[in-house]
Amino acid sequence: MKFVLLFGVLLVTLFSYSSAEMLDDFDQADEDELLSLIEKEEARAKECTPRFYDCSHDRHSCCRSELFKDVCTCFYPEGGDNEVCTCQQPKHLKYMEKAADKAKKFGGKTKKWFG
């Protein structure tokens, strides 16, 4: 009986140690993957096209605003045959960002009142 109990304790100890090692390996892999994604995002962010600049060379290169990514909008100027593309923020997204800013400001005021 003592042998079975000792063997069980040894088995549980080895199992918990091996699972802890596997979790550490997974955590390390997740951290490495996250860091590589952040580096890629930073590199990509440097190449974005600012608002109201020409985006005809790459229509997916518009920069992000605070919450949303700007959209490459193309149009024909009055009296012209050439298409012009610029990065712009759609109006509905502009209004949503303004509402979010007001909600943040209001949230800060309520914290001061009820703090």
Curated annotation (Swiss-Prot):
* Entry superkingdom: Eukaryota
Query: Which species does this protein come from?
Result: Lycosa singoriensis (Wolf spider)
Q: What is this protein called?
A: U3-lycotoxin-Ls1d
The UniProt GO MF terms for this protein read: toxin activity
Q: Which is a Gene Ontology cellular component entry for this protein? A: extracellular region
Pfam families xrefs: Toxin_35
Found in which tissues? Expressed by the venom gland.
Cited InterPro entries: Spider_toxin_CSTX_knottin, Spider_toxin_CSTX_Knottin_CS
Subcellular compartments: Secreted
What phylogenetic lineage does the species belong to?
Eukaryota, Metazoa, Ecdysozoa, Arthropoda, Chelicerata
